[in-house]
């Protein structure tokens, strides 16, 4: 398992632990399906920052970063290259 896969697995785990939601696949559109809304984005950012030790300032984030698990993993990897 490479680092991107590990990141994606951790993000999926956050959805289970934090939101009691098991994702059907990594490519499910989190926004279109309503799995992520503005409140959950805030909660998710805080959890990601804590879990991965990164800083994700809201002014640097795009809504597209939250579309899918792979996009979230990519955003975290860009923020902290040593992780991804």
Report the location of each language-model feature.
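Thiotemplate assembly-line natural product biosynthesis machinery
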Residues: 1-23, 74-84
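Short alpha-helical elements of helix-turn-helix
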Residues: 9, 39-42
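Glycine-rich loop motifs involved in handling phospho/adenylate chemistry
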Residues: 25-39, 60-68
């Amino acid at each position: 398992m490479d680092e991107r896969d590990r990141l994606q697995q951790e993000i999926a785990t956050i959805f289970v632990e934090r939101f009691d939601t098991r994702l059907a696949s990594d490519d499910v559109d989190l926004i279109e399906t309503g799995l992520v809304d503005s409140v959950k984005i805030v909660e998710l950012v805080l959890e990601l920052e804590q879990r991965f030790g990164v800083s994700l300032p809201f002014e640097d984030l795009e809504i597209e970063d939250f579309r899918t698990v792979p996009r979230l993993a990519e955003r975290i990897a860009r923020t902290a290259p040593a992780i991804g």
